[in-house]
Swiss-Prot record:
Primary localization: cytoplasm
Protein name as it appears in the record: Translation initiation factor IF-3
Keywords: Cytoplasm, Initiation factor, Protein biosynthesis
Similarity remark: Belongs to the IF-3 family.
Any one Gene Ontology molecular-function term assigned to this protein's record: ribosome binding
Encoding gene, per UniProt annotation: infC
Keyword S-adenosyl-L-methionine tagged: no
Job of this protein: IF-3 binds to the 30S ribosomal subunit and shifts the equilibrium between 70S ribosomes and their 50S and 30S subunits in favor of the free subunits, thus enhancing the availability of 30S subunits on which protein synthesis initiation begins.
Family annotation (HAMAP family): IF_3
PROSITE patterns xref list: IF3 (PS00938)
GO-annotated cellular components: cytosol
Organism: Rhodopirellula baltica (strain DSM 10527 / NCIMB 13988 / SH1)
Length: 176
């Protein structure tokens, strides 16, 4: 036995209700331009949206009465996804590890790599690792850290100042 298809809009994946999915009445309506149209029955709000060739989208379901906006739902969904994806854009954290006795040329090599990371909009965690008796000479590690920060100041800015965490001194540098 075949079931008759109803003329119902497909269920959207997110919890945003649109058009006929909004069952509560009355609703507070905001026009496409952003002006308040007041609290009106849902049927009347749907009619206004249809007349404008747009959708009635429930934007604040937790309010009493719920707030609905007359807008193009496809565009709204696209902008929402775009905003969500741009927020978690690309930023990763890369690490360069140094020691208090690291030579100048080795430091420059590590700094060049850190500059590449910063140019690619990644954050850089600079770590100076201390072993054994090096813990008695933390100031040498701080000198190395300050040298790296000074060189990287052109392409990045210090996000967290150098801090001692056990046997490590850590500093975060973000791209400018």
């Amino acid at each position: 036995m075949a079931l008759a298809r109803r003329n119902v809009q497909p269920e959207n994946r997110d919890s945003t209700r649109i058009n006929a999915q909004i069952r509560i009445t009355p609703v507070r309506v905001v026009s496409e331009e952003g002006e308040q149209l007041g609290i009106i029955p849902t049927e009347q709000a749907l009619e206004r949206a249809r007349d404008a060739g747009l959708d009635l989208v429930e934007v604040a379901p937790g309010e009493r009465p719920p707030v609905c906006r007359i807008m193009d739902y496809g565009k709204f969904k696209y902008d929402k996804n775009k905003k969500k994806n741009s927020g978690s854009s690309h930023t990763k954290t890369k690490e360069i590890r140094l020691r208090p006795k690291t030579g100048d040329e080795d430091i420059r090599t590590k700094v060049r790599q850190a500059e590449k990371f910063l140019e690619h909009k990644d954050k850089v965690q600079v770590s100076v690792l201390f072993r054994g008796r090096e813990m008695a000479h933390i100031e040498e590690g701080r000198k190395v850290m300050e040298q790296v920060i000074e060189i990287l100041s052109e392409v990045g800015k210090v996000e967290t100042k150098p801090q001692q965490h056990g046997r490590r001194m850590i500093c975060m540098i973000a791209p400018k």
